[in-house]
From Swiss-Prot:
The keyword Chaperone applies. This is Co-chaperone protein HscB homolog. The gene is hscB. It comes from the Bacteria. HAMAP family: HscB (MF_00682). InterPro entries: DnaJ_domain (IPR001623), HscB (IPR004640), HscB_C_sf (IPR036386), HscB_oligo_C (IPR009073), J_dom_sf (IPR036869). It comes from Burkholderia thailandensis (strain ATCC 700388 / DSM 13276 / CCUG 48851 / CIP 106301 / E264). One of its GO terms (cellular component) is iron-sulfur cluster transfer complex. Residues 7-79 form the J domain. GO terms for molecular function: ATPase activator activity; protein-folding chaperone binding.
Length: 175
């Protein structure tokens, strides 16, 4: 029997690992939701309705976490007792810091020139960067290199933040 305190992976009867088969996750989520959806308990007492709502909320939270690779990696590291430290650990490899500065310059230059094409190209580049970094993150997690994985998570958070900023710049320039 699964309890509310079990891990997201245990809730869906999945192995606690980074590599996840999304259709299997989706099917496991639907199976749990079909058992705990509040509509199934419409005629039940208040206590049962509350418990069903807790389970449905828990299933949604677990699903959203496991569905997103970055959230899944952060959660997996948390289960292993590793704090990603995104709020207070900004130490990064010098090469990545240089890459950040280059991206920022390109964003500023393209925005100043109102060059949506350059921003789109940079966004494509960052999507490729994200894919490559997710693959590296998976390898680090699978090999048990948790500190390296924590740094990779922080770097990916930055890549996602910059991608969102570029998207916002494109939106502003197109309207």
């Amino acid at each position: 029997m699964v309890s509310l305190k079990d891990s997201h992976f245990e809730l869906f009867h999945l192995p606690a690992q980074f590599a996840l088969d999304e259709p299997t996750l989706d099917a496991a989520y639907r199976a749990v939701q079909s058992q705990v959806h509040p509509d199934r308990f419409a005629a039940a007492g208040d206590a049962q309705k509350r418990v069903a709502m807790q389970w449905a909320t828990r299933a949604n939270e677990a699903y959203q976490t496991l569905r997103d690779p970055l959230k899944r990696a952060t959660y997996l590291l948390h289960l292993r007792g590793v704090d990603v430290g995104a709020e207070n650990n900004t130490a990064m490899e010098p090469a990545f810091l240089m890459q950040q500065m280059e991206w920022r310059e390109r964003i500023e230059d393209a925005a100043a020139a109102k060059n949506v094409g350059e921003l789109d190209a940079l966004l494509d580049e960052l999507r490729d960067e994200r894919r490559a970094r997710l693959a590296k993150l998976g390898s680090l997690l699978d090999s048990g290199s948790d500190q390296g994985a924590a740094e990779a998570v922080r770097q990916l958070m930055f890549v996602e933040r910059v991608s969102a900023e570029i998207g916002a710049q494109i939106e502003r320039l197109e309207h």
